[in-house]
Every structure is written in C-alpha cells, then in structure tokens.
Amino acid sequence: MLDKYSPAEIESKHYQNWEEQGYFQPDMDLTKPSFSIQLPPPNVTGTLHMGHAFNQTIMDGLTRYYRMKGCNTAWIPGTDHAGIATQIVVERQLAAQNVSRHDLGREKFLEKVWEWKEVSGGTITQQMRRVGCSADWTREYFTMDDVRAETVTEVFVRLYEQGLIYRGKRLVNWDPVLGTAVSDLEVESVEEQGSMWHIRYPLADNPAEAVIVATTRPETLLGDVAVAVNPEDERYTHLIGKELILPLTGRTIPVIADEYVEKDFGTGCVKITPAHDFNDYEVGKRHDTRLVNVFDLEAKVLANAEVFNFKGEAQPSFALPEKYAGLDRFAARKQMVADLQEQGFLVEIKAHTLMTPKGDRTGSVIEPMLTSQWFVAMSATPNGGEPDSEFKGLSLADKAKKAVDSGAVRFIPENWVNTYNQWMNNIQDWCISRQLWWGHQIPAWYDNEGNVYVARNQEEAEKQAGKTGLTREEDVLDTWFSSALVPFSTLGWPSETDELKAFLPSNVLVTGYEIIFFWVARMIMMTTHFTGKVPFKDVYIHGIVRDHEGKKMSKSEGNVIDPVDLIDGIDLEKLLVKRTTGLRKPETAPKVEEASRKLFPEGIPSMGADALRFTMASYASLGRSVNFDFKRAEGYRNFCNKIWNATNFVLMNTENQDCGYGATATEPRGYSFPDMWIVDRLNQTIEQVTQAYETYRFDLAAETLYSFMWNDYCDWYLELAKVQLQTGCASRQRATRHTLLRVLEAALRLLHPIIPFITEELWQTVAPMCDAKTADSIMLARFPEADSGEIVQTAFEQMTVLQDLIGAVRNLRGEMGIQPNVKAPLFVESTDDLADYLKYLPMMTRLTEAQQVATLPESEDAPVAVCNGARLMLKVEIDKATETARLSKEAEKLQKALDKLNAKLSKPGYTEKAPAHLVEKDKADLAELEDKMAKVQTQLSKLKD
C-alpha cells in the first residue's frame, strides 16, 4: 500500500535525485538523434509567473518526450541580464539609502549590481526546478558571463568590420527618467483622455489668412519645420509651397504636400516636427527638411535649438524663445498654450482620447528624441567575412526572410508567418546602444579628435589608432543584442564544437507572439549570418495566460496568480496581501480584495506541480490565449489523486500474486474481452498521444490521457477487473492481474512528460512488478510504442455491448429515481447469449442479480428499456402515492427555476447587453433545467398510467 498522495514530499525527493544523477545532461553520443531546445532566458530580476509555467511545461514536456524516445537531449537554460530592469532594481535600493549611481561612479555601481545578482538573481531558476524543468543546469548561462561577453564583443567587431554596424543620429524612443533609449517592446501605449489644440498658422505674405493645425503636443511646436497637406486636398493646393509664420517664434516654415496626411482627419493640416515624432521624421526625410531638436535629454526646453540634416550633420543653430528655456516639456506646454491664447493663435481646445507611449519600467511619457546612437544595418549587404552557406551575401533582413520563405524555419501555427513577414518588410535599422551602465559596454574607443576605433580590447584599439589615451564608449548594448546570440553563444561558437554539430539548429523554439520581431527574427539574422545555419527548425507560438475573465494578468491590477502558490498553497490572508500590494491604482484595493475572496474563499489549497503542469498542458492549443480557470487545476489535482488511488488498487490485488511476470513465468492465458479491450485502448492512446506530442498539441495529449486514465482504465476497466478477480477462474484472475500491471506501467510512461513527479514515484514501484524496470528512472525508460497487431476488433465490439447494457440499466434507475442504496433484480429478454455480459452488471449497477429470461415477467410498474435488441426490466416495488408526491414537488421546484430563468432571458436588451459568457451560461442552465423537467414529467406519466 502507498501512503496518502502528498505532492510536496515526492516532488522535492525526485527532483533532487534527478539533478544529482545527471539525468538532464546529454551523453553527447553523436550517433544518436539529437533534440535540443533553448529556454527564452527570463530576466535575472524576475520571479516565475503563469506565462513561464505555461511556456516551460511545453518545453519540458517536449524534452522529456524526446529523451524517452532515445534522443540525445539538451534543454539549455539561462537568464538575461535585463539591462534596464536590473539597473532600476539596484538604483531603487541605493535611493532608499539616499545614494545615487552617480555618487558611486560606474565601477562601484557595477560592483553593487553584481553583488545583487549573486544574492537575488537565482530565484527564477530555483522556481523552474519547482515546476519540474529537466533543463541541463550544467550548461546554465548568464547573458553577461565571461563566455557570452567574449561572444558579444566578437560579433560586434565582426559586424562593424563587415560594414553592418555604424554610429549615427536617429530618432529613438527616449525615457527621460532613465536617461536612455528604449526598445519598442519596453514602451506601453496607454489610453488617456487628453486634448486636441487647434492653432492658427498665418500665411507669411498675408497674415490675415491662416491654416488651422490640430495637435496633441503643442510643446513641440518650437521644432516644426513645415505644415503638410494632402496633394489631393483642393482646400489647400493653392497654398503648397507658400510660407507660414510659426506661432510664438517668428520663424517661417513652408507648406508641403505629402500623402501621409489624411484629408478627412482633423483639419487636413499636419505640423511636421521630424526631431520629435516618428511619422514626421519619415515625412521630413522624404522632403529633405531640417531636424530641429528643442529638448535636452531630461525633456526640458533648450535655450538654443540643435539643428541637423538627415545625414546627421550639424546645421546652423538658432535661439528658442527665452521664456521657455529650461522648462520641463509639460510646464512648457502649459505656458505655450497660455501664450497662444493671449496672442490670438489658439482657435479651440477639444477633448480627445489618445494613446500615450509610456516606459514600462518608469511610467514616464516616452519622448521621440534625436540622439547619436549605434545601429545595426538591416538592409545593407556585408563586405565579406561570412561562412559559406545559402545565406551568404544577403543582408541580415534578407537572411531572416529567406530562412522562413524556404521552409528552413517553420512557424506553428502557420498564420504567424504573415505577422513575421509584415514586420520584416517594414524593418528599420536596429538601434543597439543604451545610455545605461549595466550591460555589455560597446567595444569602441575615441581619440581627442572624435575618431572611433572598434576593437576586441583597448590594446587592439590603441594599435589601430597608433596612440594611447583613448576613451571608451560609455553606452552599453541593447539587452536583445546578447539574447539574439544565444543559439550559438551557448554552444561554443566561434570554435567548432561537438555541441554546435549536435544541437544547432535546435528543434524548436517555444515562445510568445509578442517577441517574434524583437527576439525570434534577430536570432534568425545573427545565427544564419555567423554560422550559415538557422537557429531552430520550428517556432511554436503559444498564447498569453490571462485571468478567468480574459484580462491580462498584472501585479498592478491585482489579478495575478503565482504558480508557486498553486503548487504549495497559500492561505487567504497572505493571498490578499500579495494581491493588494503594488496596485497601479491603490484605491482599487477593496475591489481587488472582494474579487479575491469570492474567487478563493479559503485561499488556494496545495495543488502540486503535476496538477499545475497538466492544467497548462490542457490549455496548450495552437496560438490561442488562455483564460486560467482555478477549478480546472483543482480537477487535475483530483486526476492525480485518481491515478494514485488506482495504483493502490492495482498493488493491493497484485503484490505477492502470480501476475505472469518474472524470469520463469509463462504468458497468461484466458484473457477476457475487457482485458483485450483495455490493451486495445492503450495502443490507440499511445498512437494518439505520440501524434499529439510530435505536433505540439499538448492539449490533445492531455485530453486523450485524461480520458484514457479516468474513463477507460479507472471507471471501466478497474471496475470490471474487480468482478474478474472475485468471480473468475485462476487463469482468468492471473490474466487480469497481468493486464492491470502492464497497462498501468505503460500509462505512467505515457503520462510522464506532462506529470513527471507522480509518475516517477509510482513507476518505481509498479515497473519492477511487470519486468519493465529497464532504467533507473522513468525519464530514461523508453516511451511506449503502439502494437497494432494486438488490436482485437471483437473485444471492442463486445465492450461496446457491455457499456450499452450498463448505460441502459443506469438510465432505468435514473428515470425511476431509484436511490443508489436500493438494489433490484434485472431481467434481460434476448435471443442472444448474454452470459459474458450479465455477470458484470450487478456490481457495476447496484443490482441484486442480473439474469437472462425468455420473456420478461408481468409487472405494470417496472420500467423497461431496449438495448441492442434486448429488453431490460428492473423489478422494483414502488409506493405510487409517495413517489408521485416526491416527483410533483420536484417538478414544482424546477418550474419556479425555469420561470425565473426564462424571465431573465426574456428581459428586453439582456441578451444583447450582458457579457456573452453570462448569457451562454444562462442558456446552458435553461437547457439543463428543461432536460430535468422532461425526465420528471416522464416518470410522473408512467406512474399515472
């Protein structure tokens, strides 16, 4: 007998043993097929969230499956240095001590960051172990460790030497609080209620006439270089080429024609500010205007404008109105609007809903800023230095396109190819520099004249310059730069290693759609460029895990479920503290608490990692977002418990018994049709689950395994086995014991990739009993293979008859409202021989007996059903008056519920205005009530006949 199922106890025991024994490591036998997978490196600052648990369940399931298929498997884990996120964490710690990074200086500050990383940076990888991830921890990397640092430098220098990296002045997303450029992924668009200011721009040659420009950013007016109109807009064609007076400045700017302007939007006139708007930048580039920068890096108004052409060359500067100099952009907005009003330029102010770009770390409004940055050229062709391959000579963007167009890289689901191509066809050069201290410092040095020397180290740079005293570039690289190299930086490149031969390309990348461009495309570019190979064969795109209402999980919204809390459990008060801390809107705390109490009235009970994993697998349909339902996780905790209890039953009935196993044992004879049927179902399940794993359909694998174990094995076969073990002859009992063990052991191996802990625990006991202990761990045992030769069609047909008979008896009992504790005899009228079936019926349908008769006995009260040509009758004694009263009371109760629900659904506007999921639930409840009412009425009519 096994002890009570305790996930915590078995999980800690087995994971530690797996890791200590080195089971996660590949044996590097290059004659074996390989399976490798890269972990999207989570931020070193991070903790495990539901998206990680979802993503890692899929990756670990694949790794365990292919390991059991005999592959040389390598799942390579690592963490990302997360430049901005990590620097913010440490800066906040220093701020609590009234110290800034500038007080410490760069070197001392970086020492503090490394100290923090060593103490706190491993949280997420420890949590990955809690989920059961069988990653090869001996290969764990950090994107700023020494090996990755050397690779980053080598790649940067080679790209520079090939003419693919350059320094230039471009418009970037600028976070004024952080003081750095940020990527598009680090910018959130937040819907806000703002204003649209309508401003008069008078004609220079006739100030009485003016065009009206509508803008949401009047503070950038100082940097305007033109006003654009649509060339087809007849209202303004006569003005094209004329000069306008720029309000508040006295400067004049031209009216230009550009198809970017929508005739029907606003006034049809758009101010063009190329140094402070991405769309305006493109318009200005087409018309070769100047770029007039009016803000410093803190987003304060400059005293003198910085003026450049589109080659980045400085142009003559000019003074900005003195009264605005030094003002923050929003203070400047307020003052300028007042001045526009006073001077008669402000026509009107309209309320306007707009999407404001904000830094995801600071919440500050992002400012498009013209700065000097380092870029990787996406469309330029390299000037040599590439490995021979089909990608040689192509630009980085064309390499990435070719990899997908040729089928070398496959997207699953396929529709994501369209998204990928859309991004690639509109690609811009990649801004790779960041004005931070934490990160890979760019390997470039400057002399006093501003000449730049890119080199692997300072000594090499000084050799290039022919002098000493060079100053190193202070900027660091975008975090995505080092992340883009992990497919080969983790395998020994630039050396030709066995790991590169065995594991590049990897088999699949499992990731979310939001980083297809930021990470997936860049890995394809870099890997094809430097190795001539694609980084991976398949890209499996999964959906986002949302809360039960379909909202994105966010700590700031108070709707996050911590996967570790699902594994370990958490009491209600601690859960409420977690959910109401750090809210974006603290005033919503009571509402968050109320919702949490309703959803988790007693907190979250311990589910265990296996239940969490099975839940995630069940959600893993291709590409769809997931609305996480806590009840489903509870159901799969019960599923694990069902497997545990089923194993207990099998052990109770097989230990110290002759089960037909052992060195001298002979094959059992006398298998019953239920024995043969469950083996049939096992083989069918093996085929279906194998297909599901190999096509990334973990949802189908989970559904198939659940149905087989719960319905076929536990609900049907174990119940039939009880009859056979109690009533069968010795050979029949031996065959049943043999089948119980055989099917259970194979099922545990089938289940292992999804629920590894419970299957390991049970397999260690079950496998030796059926000669299946072929390895020290279930993860090293072979995955089951289907034997189509074992499928017996007659067994399937016989089982169908038995299931129909049992179903008919259960329906009879239900129709007559016979209580579960009441037993009654069953009579079956049929010309067929039903002896093989009838012996199972009493135990499975609570009968006193089941017998076959030539003619059903006379009984006016007994219900009769027809099943497969046989007529079935339950002989029951019924007190008509009592039963009629009971059913009438039940009918009255059902009618009240029906009337109430019908009234709700008939209420004008309800079905149109109420949330769709509530309407669907009401309709489903109505159908269920109507079905119950029909059955009650049927029983009443029978009693009245």
Swiss-Prot record:
It comes from the Bacteria. Pfam families: Anticodon_1, tRNA-synt_1, Val_tRNA-synt_C. Its EC number is 6.1.1.9. GO terms for biological process: valyl-tRNA aminoacylation. A motif ('HIGH' region) lies at residues 42-52. HAMAP family: Val_tRNA_synth_type1. This is Valine--tRNA ligase.
